[in-house]
Amino acid sequence: MDANEILDAATSSSFAIWFLIGASLVFFMQAGFAMVETGFTRAKNAGNIIMKNLMDFCIGTIMYIVLGFGLMMSEDYVMGIIGIPNLDIFTNYSNFNWSQFVFQLVFCATAATIVSGAMAERTKFSAYCVYSAAISLIVYPIEAGWVWNYGGNGWLQKLHFVDFAGSAVIHSVGGMAALVGAIILGARIGKYTKKADGTIISNAIGGHSITLGALGCFILWFGWYGFNGAAATNTDSLASIFMNTTIAPATATVVCMIFTWIKDGKPDVGMCLNASLAGLVAITAGCASVDTIGALVIGAVAGILVDVVVEVLDKKLHIDDPVGAVGVHWANGVWGTIAVGLFATGKGDTVQAFADGSYYAGLFYGGGAKLLGIQILGIVAIDVYAAIMMTIVFQLIKHTIGLRTTAEEEIIGMDISEHGLASAYADFLPTTPSYMGESVGAVDVANLEPATLSIGEAKPTGKYTKITVICNEDKFGILKDTMAAIGVTGMTVIQAMGCGVEQ
């Protein structure tokens, strides 16, 4: 071998290793999604959120092995729309492309996990498991095959539709599934209040830890370098992808900070975290095909778009999305896909390129409207397909095993009602009745006689007495000392969170 052959072999091996490292980074993004969703929701549902994110990957892995991958990568497509599944993963073990399987698997899991946040705090765990199986088994693989089939058999591939890392295939599909699910499921108890004049007021139900949300955001941003960069085939392209994957979310976050500062009087922390993710989603389709100016504009629009969409869904359409998943993933998945038709430079590193390595340029780079038209056609087709399929899936679940928990289960929290978990933070916030640190059962107070207590001298009545006291957290110490002074030494303490009946 001469020096060039040795260099080519080393480069090929290096990128093969990087490909698997990238897949590992994408897998680690599951932790980021779990932290974002947990932080943006209430503490009483934290364990349920973690469990759903875990099952997304584990159930999805089995479904993707059984059918999903073979359906997506079929060599025998009918009109470029749906493939006849192959069974190479079972029958051709020694020659099977395991690297590609692992990479596509973690992408599939990402699409599935987006829905968790939008349907958080009121979805039956069993119903969510069925959904997770359905999207990984058949919903995602079909549309992903339109764009990413290895044999080039997908109908959008043949049109040279560009989605390098999944703004459309992953994020708009996951976001559309989240939107459909949130609509069919309905809002959380106490989220919306209807006034006498018929107007509907949106009540803020805050998450329990902005710190966890921020941690999740940084984990996702870190993982996104593998998400976007793993498929790069040369170092120049990889560096460009990394740069665009930095520019777009940074710009989106700064623009969102300024926008919310002007609009609301103060910069919104939670919205800025979502803006970072929105910028990442938006640049994903064109990360290998746009330049710095394109990345700046894509990120700037994403920073405003996420806030506007979240506000419209909440205040105007009254669709309850606890973490803003629809605004982040669907809206910016659509925007990022269309933006390729505007800002693609006509050169780069993309799996949808022509045989000579080139592809259509965008409208603002001398390519005319052809690529823009292809991008719009592709995103509309993908989203319509996702909306129809997910409506069928969620309606089937709703009318069979049921999609939503009971009001009582929702109020006490998914952790205890679905998993028997007293609290994800058992050492800090007990959510089950306790006396002197020990869990106690519920007391039937229906037949208890009212008791009176003299402040001067506490006298035992021989009866249980239940008194409910609601106080501000900063006054709890005074309440506890006062109760002790009159002889009350044991009490159950529960942190009230939420709105209306939740408090």
Task: State the predicted function of each range.
Residues 417-424, 434-503:
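Positively charged, small/polar-rich N-terminal and surface patches that mediate targeting and assembly
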Residues 2-456:
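Glycine- and aromatic-enriched membrane alpha-helices
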